[in-house]
Amino acid sequence: MIGKVAGILDFRGPDHVLIDVRGVGYIVYVSDRTLASMPGLGEAVALYTELVVREDLLQLFGFPTMIEKEWHRLLMTVQGVGAKAGMAILGALGAEGTARAITLGDARSIQAAPGIGPKIAQRVVLELKSKAPALMAMGGGTAALAPSEPPEPQPGTSSGSRRKTRAPEPPRPSHTADALSALANLGYQPTDAAQAVAQAAGESPDADTAALIRAALKLLAPKS
């Protein structure tokens, strides 16, 4: 199983990239969102990967974070959602947006992904709603992979033929998982907590952990 590919970005296609790992090129299919975030050609890149095996085809699908990879695997458990459909959903919504849509039962947002019809979107929401809290709580493992050091130049090539790698930006911390953990410690059921946190995060995307907890508690408070 190939779980991670790190090397030099050698080619960028409409739905895939070619990553050179010490002279071996790996074709990795990525979502539109991930493709847009790729560095320039000749720069270091690293992706978590999932190997999808068919009778006559092996394909690698790449993800910037482990949580996005896990969402892709979960999406493919839904009948009618294949690897490319899962990538379309993640490309349209991202991992957090997918989690929020499923938790809130928002099939229309799922349907906004290319190639996803209303029946499939509704099935995704119904089948995965109870499983969303567990993945949302994986926030500690959502950090994006930092590009590895570039491989040593191959014989016959100069080090100047590769661009210098840029220092990776520090990943934005996930406050969702911390808020979910706090609500769980307060005794709230995972599904209820996930729905409240998802709604709060959707209304205030830049909220920190404390703000998410306060907003979620207001949503969970008994209505008079």
Curated annotation (Swiss-Prot):
Residues 65-143 are annotated as: Domain II. One of its GO terms (cellular component) is cytoplasm. Residues 141-185 are annotated as: Disordered. Belongs to the RuvA family. Has three domains with a flexible linker between the domains II and III and assumes an 'L' shape. Domain III is highly mobile and contacts RuvB. The RuvA-RuvB-RuvC complex processes Holliday junction (HJ) DNA during genetic recombination and DNA repair, while the RuvA-RuvB complex plays an important role in the rescue of blocked DNA replication forks via replication fork reversal (RFR). RuvA specifically binds to HJ cruciform DNA, conferring on it an open structure. The RuvB hexamer acts as an ATP-dependent pump, pulling dsDNA into and through the RuvAB complex. HJ branch migration allows RuvC to scan DNA until it finds its consensus sequence, where it cleaves and resolves the cruciform DNA. This is Holliday junction branch migration complex subunit RuvA. It comes from Cereibacter sphaeroides (strain KD131 / KCTC 12085).
